[in-house]
Amino acid sequence: MIDAIYVQERTDETDAQCKAAKEAWDALTDAQKELVSGENADPDYFGRDTGDASKDDPLNQDDIGENELLVVSFGTSFNDSRATDIGGIEKALQEANPDWSVRRAFTAQIIINHIQARDDEKIDNMDQALERAVDNGVKNLVVQPTHLMHGAEYDELVEAIEKYQDKFETVRIAEPLLGEVGSDATVINEDKAAVAEAITAEAVKLAGYDSMDAAAEDGTAFVFMGHGTSHTANVTYDQMQTQLEKLNYKNAFVGTVEGEPEDTACEAVIEKVKEAGYKKVILRPLMVVAGDHANNDMAGDDEDSWKSQFEASKAFDSVDTQIEGLGRIKAVQDIYVAHTKAALEAEPLATAGGSNSSAALEDGTYTVDFNTDSTMFHVNEAKEGKAELTVKDGKMTAHITLPSKNIVNLFVGTAADAQKDGAKLLDPTTDTVEYLSLIHISEP
């Protein structure tokens, strides 16, 4: 039954399946619960204590009013982290925007189902949240992602909003935590600097030091573990390493659980810390939420956890962990507040009744951003992620320059659509396509 709800798609049967799975679990004896198994099932699914779910507000109420601020997160089934990390951001945004109703959406249906089945807490997915907004007569919608970067999840969020944007008078999408990605590892910005300063300040305080320098003098290194991604935005982690070095935090190291390049893998980070001569290590997540990855991949007891791997190297006198997400840090919450403020002050996206449509653009040539979702990196690096947009007689044509003629299997659209039967792959040197999408003008 757990396997049946461990899926990313919600169906008409989901509610009944969640209820049935919990009833079946409750009917087992303690001894039987320890024997639960399946492709995605184990005793921890229902049995692990992750905190009091009643302390978390799912923010799925109606009576929204005309102005909604929808806070979109990947989500976590760890109750304490959900209430503290995600809830902390939501509360900060509500306090800063009293004339707007803050509501929540998660993008991970697997997590939504887990929480519903175990705790009977119902959290909206993107479609449910947007339908709720439409049904409540929302006119002005601002979407604030809690995502770390402009990765695949952010792209999927934008795609979901595209389907509903003509239902509102104005729609705005705010920046994720670390802002624009940039073209290579050297590109940093104010958001990355603010996050680097915030996370190191919290890390040294919790470790009992006055500063990063004091920790370094004591032989302590801080390793910040990110998720990682196959998206081109993975370069963000190298940019964070660059930012930490720019701040002269020589005892700060960034690694990732997944994705490339290999120099951010656990084994590579262990070697870097060892070569730098530090004998004490403190692991901390570079993640908005301290959920499954922080508790298991970083701090778990399994031999492949980062804590276990650092200990197994025999290179360090101590290896400790700090299981705290970025979302609970006030300085980080302030960044989200600033991003929402900037979105409110910016031009809205094009809507059916809005004035910010392609026809509103004067004829001419513009520079626009474009994103790629690929197992290859830097597909859009030829001109730092920029394309040339020509507007003539209300029609738009984008010319995209690729870094190499050898790049193949291109598809204009989403990664999900590219995998569908009949998806047409392009010859980048000759093919032209028509595709309706959100276009963000970066400079005229």
Regions found by a protein language model. Give the residues of each.
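Beta-rich interaction/scaffold domains
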Residues: M1-D49
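Extended amphipathic ligand-handling, pore-lining, and cofactor/metal-binding catalytic surfaces
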Residues: Y45-I282, M287-S355
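Short, surface-exposed binding/anchoring microloops in extracellular/periplasmic proteins
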Residues: V379-E384, E388-A398, L402
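Short proline/glycine-enriched turn/loop motifs at strand-loop junctions of beta-rich domains
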Residues: P403-I407
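Short, surface-exposed beta-strand/strand-loop-strand elements in extracellular ectodomains
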Residues: V408-A418
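Solvent-exposed beta-strand/loop surfaces of large extracellular or lumenal domains
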Residues: A416-Y435
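Residue-level detector of conserved catalytic or cofactor/ligand-binding positions
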Residues: I439-P444
